[in-house]
Amino acid sequence: MAIRKYKPTTPGRRGSSVSDFAEITRSTPEKSLVRPLHGRGGRNAHGRITTRHKGGGHKRAYRLIDFRRNDKDGVPAKVAHIEYDPNRTARIALLHYADGEKRYIIAPKGLAQGAPVESGAGADIKPGNNLPLRNIPTGTTIHAVELRPGGGAKMARSAGSSIQLLGKEGTYATLRMPSGEIRRVDVRCRASIGEVGNAEQSNINWGKAGRMRWKGKRPTVRGVVMNPVDHPHGGGEGKTSGGRHPVSPWGKPEGRTRKNKASDKLIVRRRRTGKNKR
């Protein structure tokens, strides 16, 4: 993938850029693997906003992605097409299996049209192949990793992301996450080889607010420019600082803490935050 920059023909075009989509080999998705996707606009079943800054955007169809791949062990497949998916930053690859079935997977870097792909404990260590962690050599770069055996890929699925397999001891494998966090995962969990493609996605300059609206993202408004009825920081004559420690629109202190999860005990080292990111 490469980035194509626009000429500054308008203020919105100045500095903006777009993917050149050079790796895309097909413009329409496989009909049997597409489902309708209805926008919720950030509302729940009662019609109340539960997630702010969502709504609008271009109409999309959801592509069914195979995140498990455990029922196709030993069945060879070929990459028929590399396609665009509006629901994620990564590209997707359409696989044609030898038994006649078609499925989508996340397209890793280096996977091209016509490439062979397989899954199972005996699969080769090549981009796109899917194996249990116990069968992957230490030091291998992987993506689409499961948190629980059979639960489907949960980690490292976005464009350019990858996880490094640091080691294996007993029933656990040690992984270095994209955030820098080091955690342990059951060796029966499956992962795909290689890093996710479309790594230049993060370098795209969107250029104008309208392109964000096409993606279904609404404006984020600061509390200090609202009225007192809308936010605890609102109101005041002229420009103010809010007059209190930062809080949410509902008065809760900014920077909330999170409850402990059962899987937290498997974290060896926390992710880098604040000054530690350097």
From Swiss-Prot:
Spans annotated as Disordered:
1-58, 225-278
Q: Which UniProt keywords apply?
A: Ribonucleoprotein, Ribosomal protein, RNA-binding, rRNA-binding
Q: Name one GO cellular component term.
A: large ribosomal subunit
One GO biological process term is: cytoplasmic translation
GO molecular function per UniProt:
rRNA binding; structural constituent of ribosome; transferase activity
Keyword Signal present in the record's keywords: the answer is no
Pfam families, A to Z: Ribosomal_L2, Ribosomal_L2_C
The keyword Nuclease belongs to this UniProt entry's keyword annotation: no
- Quote the biased-composition stretches of kind Basic and acidic residues, using this chain's numbering: 253-267
Superkingdom as given in the UniProt entry: Bacteria
* Record field: compositional bias (Basic residues): 37-58, 268-278
The record's NCBIfam families line, in alphabetical order, gives: rplB_bact
Record note on quaternary structure: Part of the 50S ribosomal subunit. Forms a bridge to the 30S subunit in the 70S ribosome.
| UniProt record similarity statement | Belongs to the universal ribosomal protein uL2 family.
Its annotated function is as follows: One of the primary rRNA binding proteins. Required for association of the 30S and 50S subunits to form the 70S ribosome, for tRNA binding and peptide bond formation. It has been suggested to have peptidyltransferase activity; this is somewhat controversial. Makes several contacts with the 16S rRNA in the 70S ribosome.
Protein name (Swiss-Prot/TrEMBL):
Large ribosomal subunit protein uL2
Q: Which organism is it from?
A: Rhodococcus jostii (strain RHA1)
- Which gene is annotated as encoding this protein in its UniProt record? rplB
